[in-house]
């Protein structure tokens, strides 16, 4: 059975958070619902868009204004952020994914984006070909931090929790991993602070993508690579 590493997308593989925040602001301004609190918007990254806009606008996710905001945001993201995607890939990601793939790992993405948006971003960033499976929030009944997405990835790819690790920059990612019984690797270059990540009790927190590779080896017992535990 091949070891499986599942990655979050925004803030883990691609440095999209600032673009996401700007797209939120532009979309709401376009709809005459101005909201300029960048910190509050940034805090919602990692949630499905409906929940994020519902939280920001203090509206139920079923409200038509939330639906309109999501639709407008997606249009703005396509126009403003996707063209920049090749330059937004975090340092070491391409090399690390290629190394893991070459060493026999199965690779997947589990994201709070809907599948079509995730596919568009991965393709624009030049990362699509590395992944055996991409799961979006619209492919499960319960998105992160619920374990369903992690369990579905393992089921589809024939993996088990003992040989699976989740890599992410938010507690949503790490809590999903914990509840699914798999190892969790937190990364410090994304949305949540190191203290926030520690609160989710991952097995390890790393500062560079090359350390992700070493942590995967160590946690999945494929080598004696050193790893610094929290």
UniProtKB/Swiss-Prot annotation:
Part of an operon that could be involved in the biosynthesis of the blue pigment indigoidine, which is implicated in pathogenicity and protection from oxidative stress. It comes from the Bacteria. Pfam families: HAD_2. Induction: Moderately expressed in the wild-type strain. Expression is repressed by the HTH-type transcriptional regulator PecS. Weakly induced under oxidative stress. Expression is 10-fold induced during infection of Saintpaulia plants. The keyword Metal-binding applies. Its cofactor is Mg(2+). GO terms for biological process: DNA repair. InterPro entries: HAD-like_hydrolase_sf, HAD-like_sf, HAD-SF_hydro_IA, HAD_2, HAD_sf, PGP-like_dom2. The active site is at 8 (nucleophile), 10 (proton donor). Mg(2+) binds at residues 8, 10, 169. One of its GO terms (molecular function) is phosphoglycolate phosphatase activity. Disulfide bonds: none annotated. Keywords: Hydrolase, Magnesium, Metal-binding. This is Probable phosphatase IndB. Coiled coil: none annotated. Disruption phenotype: The disruption mutant cannot synthesize indigoidine. Its EC number is 3.-.-.-. GO terms for cellular component: cytosol. Gene3D superfamilies: HAD superfamily/HAD-like (3.40.50.1000), Putative phosphatase, domain 2 (1.10.150.240). The keyword Phosphoprotein does not apply. Belongs to the HAD-like hydrolase superfamily. NCBIfam families: HAD-SF-IA-v1, HAD-SF-IA-v3. The gene is indB.
